[in-house]
Swiss-Prot record:
One GO cellular component term: cytosol
Protein's UniProt name: UPF0246 protein PST_1170
One GO term (biological process): response to hydroperoxide
Recorded family membership: Belongs to the UPF0246 family.
Length: 259
């Protein structure tokens, strides 16, 4: 079983990594093409394109300028440890053992606007490029056109390496839309996490993002390997709802008292 999650806007390059293990991103030739496009933009243009403050736009223009295809521990950090934010708060990889990291390396992938698809230990230089950005490029009007079927092809390769065909979608709609389902040789399982609010269960963005990370953490820590085991997930008060679920769409509920 292979999991996919979204990246995060917040990055941490100050905290020392918990491991010396690292791998190189596999698709840097594509990333290089995007960087060359982004280098043509002024800070004001990046601000408009990405809806960023002037300060953040200037920071990211500087990042594009210093980006180099030579990735080392001195200019990059393992992706799983560099990303922060709600999903990664739930994942809490900072206490992973080496065995946890190796399991994650095989069973977890992070979707990325710049890198396409990342393994947990892939070194990553800092960037900001959300998948929904309308960056005109030689392949089309946005990043969905740029990546095309490539991400699906790479997921197929990762699944084939496992000898499996189950893809667990723990990513946002923005990012999972970069996966072309008709090109994917996999059974896709989607998951919803709903919290009680005002008398009914709803998807609340902050809680749902953290819950996706919690499920990824649980799978890694417990070495979960089959879809049949997923209904046992019970971190932080979530419980499986058989009445609301189907074989390929799992629903977990949480009461207000557990939030």
């Amino acid at each position: 079983m292979l999991m996919v999650i979204s990246p995060a806007k917040t990055l941490d390059y100050d905290t020392p990594p918990i491991t010396e293990r690292f791998t190189q991103p596999q698709y840097l030739d594509h990333s290089q093409q995007l960087i060359e496009l982004l280098r043509r933009y002024s800070p004001a243009q990046i601000s408009e394109l990405m809806h960023l403050s002037d300060k953040l736009a200037a920071l990211n223009v500087a990042r594009y300028g210093s980006w180099t295809p030579a990735f080392t521990p001195s200019n990059a950090k393992q992706a799983l440890l560099a990303f922060k934010g709600d999903v990664y708060t739930g994942l809490n990889a900072d206490d992973f053992t080496e065995d946890d990291l190796l399991f994650a390396q095989k069973h977890l992938r992070m979707l990325s606007g710049l890198y396409g698809l990342l393994r947990p230990l892939d070194l990553m230089q800092p960037y900001r490029l959300e998948m929904g950005t309308k960056l005109t490029n030689p392949r089309g009007k946005d990043l969905y056109a740029f990546w095309g079927e490539r991400i699906s092809d790479w997921l197929n390769e990762a699944l084939a390496d496992q000898g499996d065909d189950v893809l667990l979608n723990l990513a946002s709609n923005e990012y999972f839309s970069a996966v072309k389902r008709n090109a994917l040789n996999a059974r896709i399982i989607n998951v919803d996490f709903k919290d009680m609010k005002n008398g009914q269960y709803k998807i609340i963005s902050f809680y749902a993002k953290k819950a996706r990370g919690l499920m990824a953490r649980w799978i890694i820590k417990e070495r979960i390997s089959t879809p049949d085991q997923l209904s046992a997930f019970d971190y932080e008060g979530y419980r499986y709802s058989a009445n609301d679920s189907s074989a390929d769409h799992l629903v977990f509920l949480r009461d207000a008292s557990d939030q």
